[in-house]
């Protein structure tokens, strides 16, 4: 289609007081400074503001569903501007939002992989698993095409032809998300 959107629903969702990562283990990846801010709701968000935010998210999901149904290109990204929006998990949460918007789990996976390649004009080189294409790969336990929550059950990660153990990758990130750069 001629219309492309990058809704970043999870960014909107992440500032709502009820938003939480899937389990406490995600807190281990945050720097101590960011971890302290994790439970803090924005000062401007009172009860009325939270209700307004929830309504806006519902409308945003409906808009995404309509664009997708009409052939628009939906893209996935997260804009990790909230202390609650942990990189990696944020993309999983955005895919879950795509499913709540009415896309199938397989369509949500395609949005997070194939559609980015299409938008970049690189669909002939990346974005899908096909002979002759470059691909990084995440192997998961279970079938995320039937349950998007399984996308986080990582067994192996392949990057540039090298296999990585997810536990080792996670350990290397422990306590580092949100550290100042420089």
Model-predicted regions and their roles:
Residues 5, 79, 98, 108, ...:
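Divalent metal-coordination and catalytic microenvironments
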Residues 1-101, 174-182:
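Active-site neighborhoods of metal-dependent hydrolases
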Residues 64-68, 95-99, 109, 113, ...:
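Generic hydrophobic alpha-helical scaffold/packing signal
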Residues 14-15, 148, 167:
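Glycine/Thr-rich phosphate-binding loops of Rossmann-like dinucleotide-binding domains
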Residues 10, 142-144, 162:
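Solvent-exposed coil/turn segments that connect beta secondary-structure elements
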Residues 156, 160-182:
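Extracellular/periplasmic ectodomains of large secreted or surface enzymes and adhesion receptors
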Residues 86, 104-109, 118-154:
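Acidic, glycine-enriched loop/beta-strand segments at the rims
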């Amino acid at each position: 289609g001629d219309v492309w959107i990058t809704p970043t629903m999870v960014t909107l969702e992440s500032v709502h007081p009820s938003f939480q990562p899937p389990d406490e283990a995600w807190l281990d990846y945050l720097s101590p400074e960011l971890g302290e801010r994790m439970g803090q709701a924005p000062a401007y968000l009172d009860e009325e503001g939270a209700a307004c935010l929830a309504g806006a998210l519902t409308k945003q999901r409906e808009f995404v569903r309509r664009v997708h149904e009409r052939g628009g290109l939906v893209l996935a990204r997260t804009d990790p501007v909230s202390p609650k929006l942990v990189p990696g998990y944020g993309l999983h949460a955005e895919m879950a939002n795509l499913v709540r918007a009415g896309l199938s789990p397989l369509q949500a996976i395609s949005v997070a992989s194939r559609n980015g390649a299409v938008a970049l004009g690189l669909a002939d080189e990346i974005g899908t698993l096909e002979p002759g294409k470059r691909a990084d790969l995440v192997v998961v336990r279970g079938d995320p095409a039937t349950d998007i929550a399984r996308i986080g059950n990582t067994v192996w990660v392949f990057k540039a032809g090298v296999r990585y153990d997810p536990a080792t990758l996670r350990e290397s990130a422990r306590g580092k998300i949100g550290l100042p750069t420089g």
